[in-house]
């Protein structure tokens, strides 16, 4: 018996329809908001507020419809939002208010509508799904026009209440709708008088927009709407751009920005049926959730969960890793010293430490690790570097099919193509063709390829073969021909 469904949108190793797709190797600098999200995660992990496994679980738990839209770092931002709200570090109400550019307050909202006023219920067709919404406005009135008949009072926001959070008390209205306004498509089959029959629905203020009498009449005259019902997808006609809202803060519409993707009906004709669209979105640099990620960092900073100086120090350390030259330094020493090379292959952390190079992504101390049955028991979030050597018979290639685990401590941030679904899918399934077609690396047929799928807490770096013609070179000179790609196995060092 299965009590849950396991969504495999993140697990792309060997995906069939990825094999026909080219790899976009365009190199670009990460945008400031992407770097801030990466630094935020590093900082939260160091503080013990979340773990890498929790981050992964949050990403994997995103519904497929959202995962197909979100970029790599957008998924990180949505995952952090979910994890921190689960832990109570910050409330969903605070994150939503931060996104809307509204000062967080527990003060009740002032009623903005009067009895007799014409209104429209906001369509439920926009996205934000870091957590599943609790909605108390039935789908058949989404996008419908009606008339306010009563204001019973102010009630607590059910969206935040469902998560045990105290949000802002909202005015609740009773809104009358005619059948003609709700189901215009059924007009031809209506019984006599039925079009003017009606339904009165309780609707909270954030869901409502004011209409003039003229707009109300025009909408009734031109009605053609498809209501969102539990067995259908949300309407797509009212697609809103995800911008920050700095206008009148009474224009409280976080419900219609609130998270529809987990309500969407999912089709699973094949495991990878929508991957090609997701790949195209990766390449388009379309970031619908960037404003949410930016607001997340700002809200956590304002709340004191992280400090600005800590965040900037973490960014500086990531930049330093990017430019440290640690990988080329290790390779050049190994090429020059056979004993060091052997040490590097058997205990990379200790060998690197002798050169004052740290190989773990976080602050765990491998020297202090406990031992169980003679084996080291590492602390949570520790990562262990393994160095694998290319030989005349074996060429090594590094990837991560489940996310994009990478030796950040040695190489800095991974390139976008390493994170891409195409690389992750093809690396394990057709490595020889991938290297030849996308990287121009043609290997002898007799040389095998060993792919290292870094799916857990080991990180891999390739020790390339020293090219001929470098005899007598100094370590400083040798470093100049060791590239990032040669340390991943997508290239080999060359002497011009």
UniProtKB/Swiss-Prot annotation:
Which Gene Ontology molecular-function terms are recorded? Answer: nitrile hydratase activity; transition metal ion binding
Give the domain of life: Eukaryota
Matching entries from Pfam families are given as: NHase_alpha (PF02979), NHase_beta_C (PF02211), NHase_beta_N (PF21006)
Q: Which cofactor does it need?
A: Fe(3+)
Q: Where is this region: Disordered?
A: 229-269
Q: Which residues are recorded with the post-translational modification Cysteine sulfenic acid (-SOH)?
A: 405
Q: What EC number(s) are associated with this protein in UniProt?
A: 4.2.1.84
For this chain, the Swiss-Prot or TrEMBL PTM comment says:
Oxidation on Cys-403 is essential for the activity. Oxidation on Cys-405 stabilizes the Fe-NO ligand coordinated in the inactive form.
**Chain positions recorded as Fe(3+) binding sites:** 400, 403-405
The record's remark on the cofactor is: Binds 1 Fe(3+) ion per subunit.
Provide ranges: composition bias, Basic and acidic residues: 259-269
Where Cysteine sulfinic acid (-SO2H) occurs, the residues are 403
Name the residues that span the membrane: none
| Enzyme class per UniProt | lyase
Reactions the enzyme catalyzes? an aliphatic primary amide = an aliphatic nitrile + H2O
Instruction: Name the UniProt key words of this record, in alphabetical order.
Output: Iron, Lyase, Metal-binding, Oxidation
| Chain intervals with Basic residues compositional bias | 237-258
Function according to Swiss-Prot or TrEMBL: NHase catalyzes the hydration of various nitrile compounds to the corresponding amides. Industrial production of acrylamide is now being developed using some of the enzymes of this class.
Family according to the record: In the N-terminal section; belongs to the nitrile hydratase subunit alpha family.
- Put simply, this protein is called Probable nitrile hydratase
Q: What organism does this protein naturally occur in?
A: Monosiga brevicollis
């Amino acid at each position: 018996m299965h009590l849950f469904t396991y969504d495999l949108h993140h697990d792309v190793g060997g995906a069939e329809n990825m094999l026909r797709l080219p790899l976009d190797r365009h190199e670009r600098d990460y945008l400031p908001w992407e770097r801030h999200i990466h630094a935020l995660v590093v900082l939260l992990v160091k503080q013990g507020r979340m773990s890498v496994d929790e981050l992964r679980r949050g990403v994997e738990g995103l519904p497929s419809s959202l995962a197909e839209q979100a970029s790599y770092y957008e998924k990180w931002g949505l995952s952090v939002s979910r994890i921190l709200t689960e832990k109570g570090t910050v409330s969903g109400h605070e994150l939503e208010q931060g996104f809307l550019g509204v000062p967080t307050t527990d003060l009740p909202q002032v009623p903005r509508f009067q009895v007799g006023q014409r209104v429209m219920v906001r369509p439920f067709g926009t996205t934000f799904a870091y957590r599943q919404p609790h909605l108390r406005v039935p789908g058949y009135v989404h996008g419908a026009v009606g008339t306010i008949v009563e204001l019973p009072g102010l009630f607590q926001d059910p969206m935040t209440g469902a998560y045990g959070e105290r949000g802002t008390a909202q005015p609740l209205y009773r809104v009358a709708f005619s059948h003609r306004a709700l189901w215009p498509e059924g007009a031809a089959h209506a019984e006599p008088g039925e079009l003017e029959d009606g339904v009165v629905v309780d609707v909270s203020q954030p869901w409502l927009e004011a209409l003039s009498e003229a707009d109300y009449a025009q909408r009734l005259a031109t009605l053609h709407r498809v209501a969102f019902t539990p067995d259908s997808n949300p309407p797509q006609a009212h697609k809103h751009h995800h911008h920050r809202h700095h206008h009148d803060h009474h224009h409280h519409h976080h419900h219609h920005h609130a998270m529809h993707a987990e309500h969407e009906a999912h089709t699973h004709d094949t495991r990878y049926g929508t991957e090609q669209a997701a790949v195209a979105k990766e390449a388009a640099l379309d970031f619908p959730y960037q404003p949410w990620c930016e607001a997340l960092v700002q809200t956590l900073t304002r709340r004191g969960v992280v400090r600005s100086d800590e965040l900037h120090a973490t960014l500086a350390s990531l930049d330093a890793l990017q430019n440290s030259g640690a990988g080329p330094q290790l390779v050049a020493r190994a090429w020059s010293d056979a004993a060091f090379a052997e040490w590097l292959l058997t205990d990379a952390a200790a060998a690197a430490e002798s050169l004052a190079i740290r190989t773990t992504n976080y602050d765990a101390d491998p020297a202090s690790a406990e031992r169980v049955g003679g084996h080291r028991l590492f602390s949570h979030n520790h990562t262990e570097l393994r160095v694998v050597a290319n030989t005349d018979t074996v060429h090594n290639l590094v990837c991560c099919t489940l996310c994009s685990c990478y030796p950040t401590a040695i190489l800095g941030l991974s390139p976008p193509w390493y994170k891409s679904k195409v690389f992750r899918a093809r690396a394990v399934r057709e490595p020889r063709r991938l290297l030849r077609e996308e990287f121009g690396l043609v290997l002898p047929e007799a040389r095998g390829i060993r792919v290292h799928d870094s799916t857990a807490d080991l990180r891999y770096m390739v020790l390339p073969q020293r090219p001929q013609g470098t005899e007598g070179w100094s370590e400083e000179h040798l470093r100049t021909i060791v590239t990032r790609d040669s340390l991943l196995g997508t290239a080999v060092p060359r002497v011009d």
